[in-house]
Amino acid sequence: MKYDTSELCDIYQEDVNVVEPLFSNFGGRASFGGQIITVKCFEDNGLLYDLLEQNGRGRVLVVDGGGSVRRALVDAELARLAVQNEWEGLVIYGAVHQVDDLEELDIGIQAMAAIPVGAAGEGIGESDVRVNFGGVTFFSGDHLYADNTGIILSEDPLDIE
């Protein structure tokens, strides 16, 4: 499904929170949306593998990487796992790498930057916790919509039709 965050903001202005414009699109989908699962991890993506092995249909993984752009939390292997398990998208408050491969995949990926250095894989972090970045607080179960213009968040699903 295609999402237009500008149109959604016009219609649902009182019902959405707008994430500050810190992110760029690195995935093969120009827009994506779904119910979110939150993760907090710093320069370590081991926990992301466990979560992305789950069925992701209709879901978006929101990763609070502390805003670090020193190590990439998502690479092509991890993104392929997300595609295989039907995740709608990933929002990374941090960095990604292997961007040429990422843009070929049928998934939305919004991140702050790209860097060639990968993350540790120790599995350090926590999931289903409140995370805050970009001027917005994210809770697992909220609904996120993203496109090349921006990212918006709503407690309830928005009627797109």
Swiss-Prot record:
Pfam families: RraA-like
Matching CDD domains: RraA_family (cd16841)
Gene Ontology cellular component terms for the protein in this record: cytosol
GO terms of biological process kind: negative regulation of RNA catabolic process
Compartments, record wording: Cytoplasm
Major localization class: cytoplasm
Keywords assigned: Cytoplasm
Superkingdom, taxonomy of origin: Bacteria
Family to which this protein belongs: Belongs to the RraA family.
Role: Globally modulates RNA abundance by binding to RNase E (Rne) and regulating its endonucleolytic activity. Can modulate Rne action in a substrate-dependent manner by altering the composition of the degradosome. Modulates RNA-binding and helicase activities of the degradosome.
HAMAP family, alphabetized: RraA
Subunit structure: Homotrimer. Binds to both RNA-binding sites in the C-terminal region of Rne and to RhlB.
The protein, known as: Regulator of ribonuclease activity A
